[in-house]
Swiss-Prot record:
Homodimer. Its EC number is 3.1.1.96. It comes from Thermodesulfovibrio yellowstonii (strain ATCC 51303 / DSM 11347 / YP87). Pfam families: Tyr_Deacylase. GO terms for molecular function: D-tyrosyl-tRNA(Tyr) deacylase activity; Gly-tRNA(Ala) deacylase activity; Ser(Gly)-tRNA(Ala) hydrolase activity; tRNA binding. Belongs to the DTD family. This is D-aminoacyl-tRNA deacylase. Keywords: Cytoplasm, Hydrolase, RNA-binding, tRNA-binding. It catalyses: glycyl-tRNA(Ala) + H2O = tRNA(Ala) + glycine + H(+); a D-aminoacyl-tRNA + H2O = a tRNA + a D-alpha-amino acid + H(+). A Gly-cisPro motif from one monomer fits into the active site of the other monomer to allow specific chiral rejection of L-amino acids. A motif (Gly-cisPro motif, important for rejection of L-amino acids) lies at residues 137-138. It comes from the Bacteria.
Length: 146
C-alpha cells in the first residue's frame, strides 16, 4: 500500500463540476493499493498516518501529529501509485489491485482513520476527479507498507 501524504491548509475534490468534499488544515492522502496488500497494511498505514509528527510546534519543529493539531484528512484513491515505469515509456499497472477488491481496502483504511477519532473526507472511488490543494510547506511524504 502506497500513500502520498501532503500537508495542506485546505484541499477539495470536484467531480462533474461539483465540489463533493473539502477539508481545512490537515493531510491530503493519495492512496494506491497493490495486489499484495491486506487488512494488515491498512492498519499499519492508518496508525502511521495518525501518529506521524509532520506539523510544526511553537519552535518550528515537526513535532505534532494530525491529532495534536485537530486537523482533518482527505483520502483520494490513486491507482497510478501502484504503477511501474521501469520498462519502456508506458506505465504498467499489473501490480495494482483490481478495483473491486481495492475498494474494500480503501473503505477499510478510511474507517480505520475515523475509528481513531480523525475527521475524514474522501474522493469518489473509480471516478475522474479534480483535486485542488494549498500545500503548507510544501511538506510531502511517501509511505509504503512494503
Amino acid at each position: 500500500m502506497i500513500a502520498l501524504l501532503q500537508r495542506v491548509n485546505k484541499a477539495s475534490v470536484e467531480v462533474g463540476g461539483e465540489t463533493i468534499s473539502e477539508i481545512g488544515k490537515g493531510i491530503l492522502i493519495f492512496l494506491g493499493i497493490d495486489k499484495k496488500d491486506s487488512k494488515k497494511d491498512v492498519e499499519y498505514l492508518a496508525d502511521k498516518v495518525v501518529n506521524l509528527r509532520i506539523f510544526e510546534d511553537n519552535n518550528s519543529k515537526m513535532n505534532l501529529s494530525i491529532k495534536d493539531v485537530g486537523g482533518e484528512i482527505m483520502v483520494v484513491s490513486e491507482f497510478t501509485l501502484a504503477g511501474d515505469c521501469k520498462k519502456g515509456n508506458r506505465p504498467s499497472f499489473d501490480k495494482a489491485m483490481p478495483p473491486e477488491e481495492a475498494e474494500k481496502l480503501y473503505r477499510d483504511f478510511i474507517d480505520s482513520l475515523r475509528s481513531k477519532g480523525i475527521p475524514v473526507k474522501e474522493g469518489v472511488f473509480r471516478s475522474f476527479m479534480h483535486v485542488s490543494l494549498i500545500n503548507e510547506g510544501p511538506v510531502t511524504f511517501i509511505l509504503n507498507t512494503r
